């Protein structure tokens, strides 16, 4: 039975309970959850939540110092190291505040066993900061079709794909180089993975839930409008709901 390990770098921010609980209730039984923090404050906040929830599938790594040359929390730097320290057959990131539907890994495992693929992604739902539903993502993180706003720009969000250990042992260092290439991390990593491992499958299910981060209200409003406009454009382009990026074979 495949072992899946979910990886969440966190400082104990709002929404972590939702993230942890969504892994605990997975219908697929062989799933672990690895939390990593690199500050005392983050450790205390995470510990408080773990003591409250007492999750059986969760392990917590505490790094002795901050990672990143500017002293800030840099999850992409941590990723390149942590992949060598935990057990898994397949690995999936999940950000603090985001969560999976209960059948997420059941669906992922089904595709892995049915098709000759190295990695798998699921579609995502977009939620506002208060967990109110905004829309289904049929416009950006769709893998096999360009994003709604830019031709020839393909991407799967960095929390929507699940990759094999073989891939990470080969390409894991690409996480720490993403900032040096001045690209958003998930786009840079997606391109590197796809170039080297083009056998990408999809569950065709919306089982990853992405929540907008709290912050500058102007930026939040822009993000909301961008997502909603993207959904509107693609809905008008494919009014029958038959999307070309939904495939039965990979």
Which functions belong to the PLM regions below?
Residues 1-250:
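Nucleotide-sugar donor-binding/catalytic module of glycosyltransferases
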């Amino acid at each position: 039975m495949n072992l899946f390990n979910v990886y969440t770098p966190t400082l104990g921010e709002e929404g972590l309970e939702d993230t942890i609980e969504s892994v605990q209730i997975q219908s697929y039984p062989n799933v672990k959850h690895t939390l990593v923090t690199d500050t005392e404050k983050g450790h205390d906040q995470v510990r408080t939540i773990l003591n409250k929830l007492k999750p059986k599938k969760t392990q917590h790594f505490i790094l002795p110092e901050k990672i990143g040359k500017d002293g800030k929390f840099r999850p992409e730097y941590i990723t390149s190291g942590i992949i060598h320290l935990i057990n898994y057959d397949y690995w999936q990131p999940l950000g603090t505040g985001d969560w999976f539907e209960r059948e997420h890994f059941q669906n992922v495992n089904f595709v892995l066993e049915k098709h000759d693929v190295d990695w798998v992604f699921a579609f995502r739902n977009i939620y506002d900061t208060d967990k109110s539903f905004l829309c289904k993502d049929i416009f950006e993180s769709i893998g096999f079709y360009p994003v709604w706003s830019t031709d020839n720009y393909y991407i799967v969000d960095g929390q929507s794909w699940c990759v094999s250990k073989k891939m990470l042992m080969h390409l894991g260092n690409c996480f720490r180089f993403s900032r040096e290439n001045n690209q958003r991390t998930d786009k840079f990593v997606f391109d590197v993975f796809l170039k080297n491992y083009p056998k990408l499958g999809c569950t065709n299910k919306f089982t990853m839930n992405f929540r907008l981060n709290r912050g500058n209200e102007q930026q939040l409003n822009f993000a909301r409008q961008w997502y909603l406009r993207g959904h509107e454009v693609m809905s008008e382009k494919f009014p029958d709901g038959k999307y070309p990026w939904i495939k039965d074979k990979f």
